[in-house]
């Protein structure tokens, strides 16, 4: 009986470690504000997938899904900065390993290798992914006009908070 219980426990643990997780309602925020201007936006429709078997992790967000406190900011963001008609989404592809998200981040058609602190915590039948890091806006080919350069922080702070459900 003990042997059977041990085998069932091992099989159950192995099935959890090989589980795939998904959300289409992840939260991503960015803050590129300065003392002169509050420039923050949030998207609650990020897609994230995680494979518990091999640690593969992917996150993507439509640029038009970011909501600003003022409609004009949102319009300028999509038309003048990220050019969301040409570059509709930001995508991270990589893996979760040793409390790090390691991979490639593609924004505005430019890919950069990233290695950022992240947590992945099991919560019932889900896992919660959290990360907070900064990116240099110009590293992704997004030009900041001189006329507004003092209003925009060249380092955008990105926060990721996604609860992924088992598939």
PLM regions and their residue ranges:
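Bacterial N-terminal signal peptides
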Residues: 6-15
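Low-complexity, acidic/polar, glycine-enriched regions of mature
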Residues: 18-167
């Amino acid at each position: 009986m003990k042997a059977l219980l041990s085998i069932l426990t091992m099989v159950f643990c192995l099935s959890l470690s090989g589980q795939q997780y998904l959300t289409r309602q992840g939260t991503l925020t960015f803050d590129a504000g300065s003392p002169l201007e509050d420039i923050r936006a949030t998207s609650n429709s990020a897609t994230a997938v995680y494979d518990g078997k091999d640690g593969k992790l992917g996150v993507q967000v439509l640029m038009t899904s970011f909501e600003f406190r003022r409609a004009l900011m949102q319009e300028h963001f999509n038309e003048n900065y990220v050019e969301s008609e040409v570059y509709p989404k930001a995508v991270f592809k990589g893996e979760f390993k040793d409390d790090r998200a390691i991979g490639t981040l593609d924004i505005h058609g430019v890919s950069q290798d990233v290695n950022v602190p992240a947590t992945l915590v099991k919560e019932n039948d889900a896992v919660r992914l959290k990360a907070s890091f900064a990116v240099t806006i110009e590293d992704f080919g997004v030009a900041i006009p001189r006329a507004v350069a003092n209003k925009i922080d060249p380092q955008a702070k990105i926060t990721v908070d996604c609860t992924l459900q088992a598939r």
